[in-house]
Amino acid sequence: MKKKILVAGGTGYIGSHTTVELQNAGYDVVIIDDLSNSNIEVLDGIEKITGIRPEFIKLDLKDKEGTREALKAHPGINGIILFAASKAVGESVQQPLKYYRNNVVTLVNLLELMPEFNIEGIVFSSSCTVYGQPDPENLPVTEDAPIKPATDQRRDHPRYYSRKRSVQEHYPALLQPDRCSPECRNRRIA
């Protein structure tokens, strides 16, 4: 039986390319996206490339009950890849509550619903911003690189953003400690 993956934010640039790769590798894909940073025509492009139109649900993942209903309607999801997040550093400083609601509430909702639907894994797309400015000898940046945000102390600096992103990476182990083995650690895609 084919594995089924939920790609949250799957009509965005990275999400759509990930969907193509998953479908080409033989996975069934369900996309949930609110289309706030993309458009529905992306599904046509995915279908043109792979020959398969992925299942699509237009939904804001901050809506926990709506997310629960979507998961009920699409049983058998094995894992989630989460790209549904706001990502502009400058805007996150200007509108921190908007970013908190979108990025943190979405992640927490999914983590809380995963046990209910026996979804075992989640890949959380982070940001290279958590690493700060890497030393040239440490390039390319790898997922085990030290977190070293910018040193500027002002709240409006990218350091503030990188701290928020770094904290989000630790939520899975905090919210599901009984499901996290010693191997349950962050794997960043830089």
Question: Predicted segment positions?
Answer:
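N-terminal Rossmann-like NAD(P)+-binding domain of SDR-like oxidoreductases, especially those catalyzing
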Residues: M1-C180
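Hydrophobic, Gly/Ser/Ala-rich alpha-helical and linker tracts in large acyl-processing enzymes
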Residues: K164, S181-A190
